[in-house]
């Protein structure tokens, strides 16, 4: 068979002999035995031999250097690494900050464009703007404060002339006081000084009771004070319905208010 393989031209590799296999196994067993003999031996002897070898080589090479020299070399390495990391972080931050310029530029362009959005809207007329300001003032003002925009501009009906509580229609403060003066209600708190001129005066003792009555008329949850009611009367001085007289706690209605009040009084049914 061997000759036939040679004649056909195929390379021939002889199979391993039994002696070679036996030799390798014996070598492996011998090396394994030597390895375990080293492990199972006395560990102290090997440890002593190791430290003797290390001590011999270290002191022979570096015995000329002082001891503190090695400590300084070990303490210098970490700061050098930290400086390297910080330098790398600064470079990364510089690279990241560079592309942020275009978004800021576009943002400033958007802000500059914002006022143009309001231009197409038509401006409010003076009358409409004044009405919006009055409504906004009522929403922002405290609930107890009497504002000048509390009236709806309608002529008060007969049910409002005597300050009836719970009415759905609004009544202004000057009309409320005029109704009290003409009806004689709460005459201990307010009275005429000169009816023809429209001058009236509050009582220094009972003015708070009248203010409380006005708070109930408005539907306020908290108690109305004379100070807030007098503030509303001073606001009427700007529009002309009521003006302050130099005398203490004394005010005067305008002729227009007295005329409207006389017309409403004539509309009342006879008792």
Curated annotation (Swiss-Prot):
Pfam families per UniProt: Ets
Phosphoserine modification, residue list: 141, 147
GO biological process: one example: lipopolysaccharide-mediated signaling pathway
Stretches for region Disordered: 124-164
Composition skew (Low complexity), residue ranges: 154-164
Keyword Hydrolase among record annotations: no
Record GO terms (molecular function): chromatin binding; cis-regulatory region sequence-specific DNA binding; DNA binding; DNA-binding transcription activator activity; DNA-binding transcription activator activity, RNA polymerase II-specific; DNA-binding transcription factor activity; DNA-binding transcription factor activity, RNA polymerase II-specific; DNA-binding transcription factor binding
GO (cellular component) term, any one: nucleoplasm
Subcellular locations according to the entry: Nucleus
Amino acids binding DNA: 218, 231, 234, 244
S-S bonds: none
Name of the protein in its database record: Transcription factor PU.1
Cited InterPro entries: Ets_dom, ETS_fam, WH-like_DNA-bd_sf, WH_DNA-bd_sf
Activity regulation details: Transcriptional activity at macrophage-specific genes is inhibited by interaction with GFI1, which results in the inhibition of SPI1-induced macrophage differentiation of myeloid progenitor cells, but not that of the granulocyte lineage.
DNA-binding region: 171-254
Family to which the UniProt record says this protein belongs: Belongs to the ETS family.
Oligomeric form and interacting partners: Binds DNA as a monomer. Can form homomers. Directly interacts with CEBPD/NF-IL6-beta; this interaction does not affect DNA-binding properties of each partner. Interacts with NONO/p54(nrb). Interacts with RUNX1/AML1. Interacts with GFI1; the interaction represses SPI1 transcriptional activity, hence blocks SPI1-induced macrophage differentiation of myeloid progenitor cells. Interacts with CEBPE. Interacts with IRF4/Pip and IRF8. Interacts with JUN. Interacts with RB1. Interacts with TBP.
Function as written in the Swiss-Prot or TrEMBL entry: Pioneer transcription factor, which controls hematopoietic cell fate by decompacting stem cell heterochromatin and allowing other transcription factors to enter otherwise inaccessible genomic sites. Once in open chromatin, can directly control gene expression by binding genetic regulatory elements and can also more broadly influence transcription by recruiting transcription factors, such as interferon regulatory factors (IRFs), to otherwise inaccessible genomic regions. Transcriptionally activates genes important for myeloid and lymphoid lineages, such as CSF1R or FCER1A.
Chief place where the protein resides: nucleus
Keyword terms: Activator, Developmental protein, DNA-binding, Nucleus, Phosphoprotein, RNA-binding, Transcription, Transcription regulation
